[in-house]
A protein has these predicted regions:
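N-terminal Rossmann-like dinucleotide-binding module
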Residues: 27-77
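Conserved N-terminal Rossmann-fold NAD(P) cofactor-binding segment
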Residues: 68-97
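A short helix->loop->beta-strand "cap" motif at the edges of active sites that frequently abuts
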Residues: 85, 121-123, 148-151
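Beta-loop-alpha module in the N-terminal Rossmann-like domain of NAD(P)-dependent dehydrogenases
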Residues: 89-120, 132-135
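General beta-strand structural signal in soluble alpha/beta enzymes
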Residues: 104, 127, 153-157
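Rossmann-fold NAD(P)-binding glycine/threonine-rich loop
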Residues: 130-151
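Conserved anion/nucleotide-ligand pocket segment
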Residues: 151-201
Length: 201
């Protein structure tokens, strides 16, 4: 077997192996670890992507939710797939796992709780709760903390679908686009405005 170094920007840790008339691309993946804060529907989608092998370079090592049963459900699903995932009951416990990335899928309040400690921990953040960053003082604190600690905060479109499409339409110049978004009545459960009659409308 002859190993040929492959200097591909797509596969920086790859090399070609030639065996007879066949060539094989061998890739060493630098696995990144991540944790999830908030174990609702979006966290379920992310964890299922791990189970299905759609995120081969990432390992989910811990989950946290104020509702422990939700975190246990995700960790249980990971265990069924032969993957280890810790159920954490505090933010400190989650960050003690020293993840590369924290995926925040909970709420603006959760981002306020996790952002600065995570960034100081050497953990970058992917957040779906961008509303918390509308507070100028908090935004500046997060940016400064990230710079000081060599970490990053990635702002995702979040639970409101269509923002990526709207950004694309904006790049088209004189395009016109309309965006409609509806949430089901279950999204209001546990709030003062929820009424059972909403289920029938």
């Amino acid at each position: 077997m002859t190993a040929l170094l492959c200097l591909s920007s797509l596969f920086p840790f790859s090399f070609m192996v030639k065996h007879g008339n066949r060539k094989y691309l061998c890739t060493f993946v630098n696995m990144k670890t991540f944790v999830i804060a908030g174990c609702g529907r979006l966290a379920g989608i992310v964890s299922e992507a791990v189970v299905k092998g759609l995120l081969p370079e990432y390992e989910l090592v811990g989950v946290y939710s104020r509702t422990v049963a939700k975190a246990e459900r995700i960790a249980g699903r990971m265990a069924e797939a032969g993957k280890s995932c810790a159920v954490c009951t505090t933010a400190d416990e989650l960050l003690a796992l020293k993840p590369d990335i924290l995926v925040e899928t909970a709420s603006p309040a959760a981002l306020r709780e996790f952002a600065v400690p995570a960034l100081k921990n050497g953990t970058s953040i992917v957040t779906l709760s961008i509303g918390a960053l509308a507070d100028d003082a908090f935004y500046r604190e997060v940016c400064e903390t990230a710079k000081e600690n060599g970490t990053r905060i990635y702002i995702a479109s979040g639970a409101t679908g269509g923002f990526d499409v709207l950004r694309t339409a904006a790049l088209m110049g004189k395009a016109t686009a309309r965006f409609y978004n509806e949430k089901g009545p279950d999204a209001l459960k546990g709030t003062p405005v929820y009424e059972e009659a909403l289920q029938k409308e």
